[in-house]
Amino acid sequence: MKKTIFIKNALILTVSSLILRFVGIIFKVWLAQLIGSEGIGLYQLIFSVYMLAATFATSGISTAVTRLAAEELALGTKRGTLKILRRAIEITLIVAGVTVVTVFFGAEFIAVRFLNDIRAVPALKILPLSLPFMGISSCLRGYFIARRKITPNAVSQLLEQAVRIILIVVLVGKFCTKGLGACAAAVILGDSAAEIFSFLMLWLIWLRDTRKLDNLTGRARPPFGIVRRILHISVPITSGRYLNTALRTGENILVPKNLAKYPFGGENALSQFGMIKGMALPI
């Protein structure tokens, strides 16, 4: 039985990942045709900051939730399982809140000093709005993995991608005439709205799933030290992710800056960066 569930979950993850990757490539090609290589370059710069902020917001908490919730489920305790999830959400909301304030109020500073492009400011102000929802979604995904239910995660990601594409098509079509800054902001707004939609889906599925935990009658372990246990698991994982994401963000910021030093100029440098990072590498 366990082997069958493992194979089923592995197949669901594999198929959903392939679909997401294929659809993502097709979408990137369409987006590049609409906003051009320079627009893709600007979006990639902003997206680098987005990924760094998302790494801080999620804080490697999903793995901690999966492990600790699985332990509580093995003991047959609903209260302990939900307490783990509640504490994890509290931690991720605190970290996400700090990240939201930092990025939102530091948008102009980040755009001018790091990205070297003032057009990124509107997108950077929109960017952090979805981070708390992304953090909670990460916790819920960890919970569903502990429950050995991969379908909610896969379905939410597929529908999130569908919503993202629809929203970006509509928003970019509406704002693309107002400049590349507006285009980048429209894309980030579509990304953020899709993340919020994914959270709502996972939350509704979670509400329904928790009713099935009522038959768990095991005795919960003492609640002391839950935060410490979560941090003990998540901090080592998070440290590596922070470093990896920070290095990639630094690379994406430095490449167009250095390309701009050569004769083809700043705008062409951003176009070259867009062709490399946003168009060639994804394929």
Segments the model singles out, each with a brief description of its role:
Residues 117-140:
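Alpha-helical transmembrane segments of multi-pass membrane proteins
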Residues 133-156:
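Membrane-interface junctions at transmembrane-helix termini in multi-pass inner-membrane proteins
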